[in-house]
Amino acid sequence: MNLKTKYKTKIVPLLQKEFGFSSVMQVPKIEKIVINMGVGDATKDAKLLELAQAELQAISGQKPVITKAHSSNASFKIRQGQAIGCKVTLRGEKMWNFLEKLINIALPRVRDFRGLSNRAFDARGNYTLGIKEQIIFPEIIYDNVKKIRGFDVTLVISSDNAKYNHRLLLELGMPLIKTKEHANG
């Protein structure tokens, strides 16, 4: 059973019953996943940005958009409009496929992995995690990697209640660290 089917058939009814939602539409759902890779060295060498784009495309299955600096900053030696990274926004089937790959394949390959933080929810209930090495994804061939590079993965969730969102991520199989506060979940 894939993750999307599990969400629709098992997780939605469970959360609806557990939190007393009157409608299925009240149950939190993942709207999109944004993967952002900052390439600070791109200011010196434009080829690094192309390599990062290719890696991000291999990981996500979608062509990344180049992100540019909003303002100049002399301490970072960047000018306004200069390319400094790339990002991908995944929705629909690609989003579910990426999430399944992240949970079942990539995160178990992280060295000394003890679980994801419970404190990574922002004020709007979105969950962000940092991946330190792109090589944990099977699409990246280690011998072709010029530089180990990390990126951020943000799960944008429809609800702004961190308690509901935490429970949703646990049910989806995210390896969140269990604390006393969330011990029953």
Curated annotation (Swiss-Prot):
Listed Pfam families: Ribosomal_L5, Ribosomal_L5_C
GO cellular component, one term: ribonucleoprotein complex
Superkingdom assignment: Bacteria
InterPro entries reported in the protein's UniProt record: Ribosomal_uL5, Ribosomal_uL5_bac-type, Ribosomal_uL5_C, Ribosomal_uL5_CS, Ribosomal_uL5_dom_sf, Ribosomal_uL5_N
Keyword RNA-binding among record annotations: yes
GO BP of this protein: translation
UniProt GO MF annotations: rRNA binding; structural constituent of ribosome; tRNA binding
UniProt KW keywords: Ribonucleoprotein, Ribosomal protein, RNA-binding, rRNA-binding, tRNA-binding
Function: This is one of the proteins that bind and probably mediate the attachment of the 5S RNA into the large ribosomal subunit, where it forms part of the central protuberance. In the 70S ribosome it contacts protein S13 of the 30S subunit (bridge B1b), connecting the 2 subunits; this bridge is implicated in subunit movement. Contacts the P site tRNA; the 5S rRNA and some of its associated proteins might help stabilize positioning of ribosome-bound tRNAs.
The family this protein is said to belong to: Belongs to the universal ribosomal protein uL5 family.
Subunit structure: Part of the 50S ribosomal subunit; part of the 5S rRNA/L5/L18/L25 subcomplex. Contacts the 5S rRNA and the P site tRNA. Forms a bridge to the 30S subunit in the 70S ribosome.
Protein name per UniProt: Large ribosomal subunit protein uL5
Species assigned in the record: Mycoplasmoides gallisepticum (strain R(low / passage 15 / clone 2)) (Mycoplasma gallisepticum)
Lineage: Bacteria, Bacillati, Mycoplasmatota, Mycoplasmoidales, Mycoplasmoidaceae
Gene this protein is translated from: rplE
